[in-house]
Amino acid sequence: MLARLVLGTSGRAALGSVEPALGGLKSIWRCSQAFCSTPKGVTYRELKSLLNSKDIMLIDVRNTLEILEQGKIPGSINIPLDEVGEALQMNPVDFKEKYCQVKPSKSDRLVFSCLAGVRSKKAMDTAISLGFNSAQHYAGGWKEWVTYEISEEKQES
């Protein structure tokens, strides 16, 4: 039926040539689904655990003024979104000089955060495109972090 919709009523010869192509498309689709379904977001609890284990580099991509006005997640470093691509391609000496941290390797686990997840997702996509395949983002961002932290402080009181 699909062959007739695509190729008209040309018959079995056309159907024979379409089936291998459809098989190839199905294979590509399965591979893309596996890639796309890889979890790239972290939750508040996962981020807390990762920060406690010191197993990540948390990069806040908000601009410096936002961080000064609102605060930041402890342990994060600030690399504004418009600098992420350039920063991840810097040589290690320049990176250390500018950001006071050792430059991450492509195998290191990076987590990006922002205010509410939009910019951190863009930063993660940039990092992945540069070969940092373990990059993730904290979609809840600073807004969610503050909410959970205040809630935990109240429970401890």
Curated annotation (Swiss-Prot):
The modification N6-succinyllysine is found at residue 96. Gene3D superfamilies: Rhodanese-like domain. The gene is Tstd3. Transmembrane segments: none annotated. InterPro entries: Rhodanese-like_dom (IPR001763), Rhodanese-like_dom_sf (IPR036873), Thiosulphate_STrfase_CS (IPR001307). Residues 52-154 form the Rhodanese domain. Signal peptide: none annotated. The active site is at residue 114. This is Thiosulfate sulfurtransferase/rhodanese-like domain-containing protein 3. One of its GO terms (molecular function) is thiosulfate-cyanide sulfurtransferase activity. It comes from the Eukaryota.
